[in-house]
């Protein structure tokens, strides 16, 4: 079976031409595999093991994903014959088309499929992810995770895959080493005349690795890598950064024991929740997190523009809910102010993380308490209690709810004017909280 691939504005990557294939069609696309479990969200990211070390609430519901698109070699005329052109499945790059490394990723996937490789289920994890192997034995190009049918394609029903793409789009210049990721829509004809089925998937470059962070001690990791992953997690309010979704990048064989190891973050399906929640930062108590940011890291944080990032997400991922985008803006502002005030990554993460009281009940984090005060100042809470959020907070709630003495704040209930007033009030409250944290850390 062949598959048609959407153009990158008629740009053909040179490396694909060199392999005598181009991005117009591919062979050996396994429809049964792509059709399987479209509505489920899985956690096997980057082909890594299914290690989580966490309760079911903490398990990642998504994974970095890879899509198969390619074009076999042919004669001088690469176009399909007229009688088959109407029956070819089509692949469209829905989001991330122009982002760093996406065109190259699609080209490599195309070349791999053209060379005769097939999709195979990934080993380990919660299942559902598909590996695209390269032309050399044991080499993986990408992981594919189908995520929806026609309904999901139209409405982006699976929000986890949107967050995977969002994390990549927000990793400017590859600062945190998020691998190239794009959103793909695959349309395939079925037996009924003039009928097609549509599958949505995300595609992400496979990360070559031998270990995840849970299999090595943190002393082996470079300070820069820990800081960069942490900066990304703070911006995204990642509630699922456990050791199993931090991969340890393979160093050159000649220097395996001579230099700190770099990290690659995967599995971002539980970042950017739609209401404030308790993040999980595996790196929080690593020694690197207590070291000051470098000048380059401070410059990067200072350069972040939360309002421009918000516009990027609205343009590329219009189905991502506005409360999630506002979480990004808020967390980025918090990160910028905290870093400028001289706080280290561990201090920033600690302010965002809830503590357990003597009665083993979660209390508000410092960050949440600031947000609650600012929210209540511009939008007084309702006297009627709302049911508590279900699970991880992703895709939950557009209002402030109360239960058991604790509030879960979302910003979907704020008008544009109220949101602007909230940010203004938040920034008024923030300096005193940052000063208090600095005094506590130095005492």
Language-model features: locations:
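ATP-dependent kinase catalytic cores of phosphoinositide-metabolizing enzymes
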Residues: 1-239, 243-443
């Amino acid at each position: 079976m062949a598959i048609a691939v959407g153009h990158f504005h008629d740009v053909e990557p040179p490396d694909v031409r060199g392999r005598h294939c181009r991005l117009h069609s591919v062979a050996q696309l396994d429809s049964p595999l792509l059709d399987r479990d479209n509505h489920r969200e899985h956690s096997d990211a980057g082909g890594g093991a299914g290690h989580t070390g966490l309760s079911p609430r903490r398990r990642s519901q998504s994974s970095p994903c890879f899509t198969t698109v390619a074009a076999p070699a042919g004669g001088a005329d690469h176009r399909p014959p007229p009688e088959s052109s109407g029956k070819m499945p089509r692949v469209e790059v829905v989001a991330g088309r122009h982002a760093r490394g996406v065109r190259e990723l699609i080209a490599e996937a195309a070349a791999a499929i053209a060379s005769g490789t097939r999709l195979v289920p990934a080993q380990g994890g919660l299942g559902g992810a598909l590996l695209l192997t390269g032309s050399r034995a044991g080499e993986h190009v990408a992981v594919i995770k189908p995520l929806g049918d026609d309904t999901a394609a139209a409405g982006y029903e699976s929000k986890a895959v949107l967050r995977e793409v969002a994390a990549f789009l927000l990793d400017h210049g590859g600062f945190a080493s998020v691998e190239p990721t794009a959103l793909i829509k695959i349309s395939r004809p079925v037996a009924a005349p003039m009928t097609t089925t549509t599958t949505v998937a995300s595609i992400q470059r496979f990360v070559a690795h031998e270990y995840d962070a849970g299999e090595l001690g943190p002393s082996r990791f470079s300070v820069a890598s820990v800081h960069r992953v942490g900066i990304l997690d703070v911006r995204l309010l990642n509630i699922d950064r456990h050791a199993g979704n931090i991969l340890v990048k393979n160093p050159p064989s000649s220097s395996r024991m001579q230099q700190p190891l770099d990290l690659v973050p995967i599995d971002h399906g539980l970042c950017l929740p739609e209401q404030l929640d308790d993040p999980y930062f595996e790196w929080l108590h690593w020694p690197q997190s207590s070291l000051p940011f470098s000048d380059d890291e401070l410059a990067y944080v200072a350069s972040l523009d939360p309002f421009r990032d918000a516009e990027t997400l609205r343009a590329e991922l219009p189905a991502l809910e506005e409360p999630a985008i506002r979480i990004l803006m808020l967390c980025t502002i918090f990160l910028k102010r905290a870093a400028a005030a001289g706080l280290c990554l561990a201090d920033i993460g600690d302010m965002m993380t809830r503590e357990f009281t003597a009665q083993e009940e979660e209390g508000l984090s410092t960050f949440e308490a600031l947000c609650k005060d600012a929210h209540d100042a511009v939008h007084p809470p309702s006297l009627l209690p709302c049911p508590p959020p279900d699970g991880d907070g992703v895709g939950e709630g557009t209002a402030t709810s109360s239960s058991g003495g604790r509030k879960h704040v979302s910003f979907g209930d704020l008008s544009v004017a109220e949101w602007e007033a909230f940010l203004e009030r938040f920034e008024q409250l923030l300096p005193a909280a940052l000063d208090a944290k600095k005094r506590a850390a130095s005492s």
